[in-house]
Design a protein with these regions (language model features):
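Acidic, polar ligand-binding/catalytic clefts
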Residues: 65, 69, 73, 77-142, ...
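Bilobed "Venus flytrap"/periplasmic-binding protein-like clamshell domains
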Residues: 37-46, 56-71, 105, 125-181
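Bacterial N-terminal signal peptides
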Residues: 7-17
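Extracytoplasmic small-molecule ligand-binding "clamshell" domains
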Residues: 24, 31-101, 286-288, 296-299, ...
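Sec/Tat signal peptide C-region and signal peptidase I cleavage site
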Residues: 16-24
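Sec-exported extracytoplasmic/periplasmic mature domains
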Residues: 31-32, 68-76, 93-97, 105, ...
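Solvent-exposed, polar/charged alpha-helical surfaces in well-ordered, non-transmembrane soluble domains
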Residues: 28, 61-69, 90, 94, ...
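Extended ligand-binding regions for polar small-molecule ligands
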Residues: 62-65, 69-71, 134-137, 141, ...
Length: 339
């Protein structure tokens, strides 16, 4: 009887401990260790790339910096884990990272079968093709019989197979796990075509020996909504990551920038006051301070600032806003209201 009671007691204690850990969740873990562990690419200029001093920057990096600003009031409290396409989901599932912000496409399978949640879209992309100008090709429909370089374990690999089959063209896949291996193989002439998300083509072209000798073809063959990913079952962390991105988008729409956010603390616009934490208790609902969005905007900037700084027309990538412009300016970028 005593053994039974002891076993029941131990079982209850273990259940309570497990429940406590589950309740604590990722946000509590992040606060305890003092930083956000962010999964990023192994080097994609404009999105997640480290300079010679190891400082990370990019559109995806800014999401992680925004999360850190919301949690700690300090956007620098982030550590980065470079991951290949094959490694990224396992790293998130295992708890090696807190959030994956790595040019990752939101698909039905990834959202429903891997135990993961996508927290929004920070870049609307589409798959494209890059070739050498000397090939004399002006359309992807002229690529029949080509050798195509791509990454393993990506939607890119699946999309290219669908595209060539749908257009009754033969092709050969030359696939690698790491992006630098793909770029290197293409640069050395091991394949005729390099395919990935179009934003990635512009970014990786900068790494080629003679970047001006290559063109991105006009066809976009897929929808690739890219965004941050978290584990399922932790709604508090999911909400925080989701609303970090939403705050940046809302800030751009309201005209709140890193330069003017201090003056916005006395705005007469109720929506702005809610955004910067002067009205409402939205930070408390997220488990952080009510100045969470103010800190994001002050230290990282709004979505438009992040886009322009990392991938916009004045950067080496030179990407126009296109569909990533605000809904009010001809694009589809849109966030729910903070109210």
């Amino acid at each position: 009887m005593k053994k039974t009671l002891l076993a029941l007691g131990l079982g209850t204690a273990m259940s309570v401990a497990a429940a406590t850990a589950a309740t604590a969740g990722t946000l509590a873990d992040v606060k305890a260790k003092g930083h956000v562990q962010c999964g990023v690419s192994q080097g994609l200029p404009g999105f997640s790339n480290a300079d010679s001093k190891g400082k990370w920057a990019g559109l995806d990096v800014d999401v992680c910096r925004g999360i850190a600003a919301a949690v700690f009031g300090d956007a620098t409290k982030v550590k980065y884990t470079p991951l290949s396409s094959k490694e990224r989901f396992t790293a998130l599932q295992s708890g090696e990272i807190d959030v994956l912000s790595r040019n990752t496409t939101w698909t039905a399978t990834r959202d429903t079968a891997l135990g993961l949640n996508f927290a929004g879209v920070n870049y609307y992309d589409g798959q494209g093709f890059m070739v050498r100008k000397s090939l004399g090709v002006t359309s992807a429909l002229q690529l029949g019989g080509a050798a195509v370089c791509t990454n393993t374990g990506t939607t890119t690999e699946l999309n290219v197979a669908d595209y060539f089959r749908a257009n009754n063209m033969k092709f050969e896949v030359v696939a690698f796990e790491k992006s630098d291996e793909v770029v290197g193989a293409y640069d050395k002439g091991r394949c005729d075509v390099y395919t990935t998300d179009q934003s990635g083509l512009y970014a990786q072209r900068l790494k080629l020996t003679n970047s001006k000798d290559h063109i991105v073809l006009p066809e976009i063959i897929s929808k690739e909504p890219l965004g941050p990913v978290v584990r399922q079952g932790d709604d508090q962390w999911f909400n925080l990551v989701k609303w970090t991105l939403n705050a940046m988008i809302n800030a751009e729409e309201m005209g709140v920038t890193s330069a003017n956010v201090d003056s916005m603390l006395t705005s007469k616009n109720p929506a702005v006051l809610r955004l910067v934490g002067k009205e409402g208790s939205f930070g408390e609902n997220l488990g952080v301070g009510n100045d969470w969005a103010y800190n994001i905007i002050k230290q990282v900037g709004n979505y438009g600032e992040s886009f322009d700084r990392n991938v916009g027309p004045k950067t080496p990538l030179g990407i126009a806003r296109g569909v990533n412009a605000l809904w009010s300016k001809g694009g589809i970028m849109y966030a729910p209201p903070i109210r």
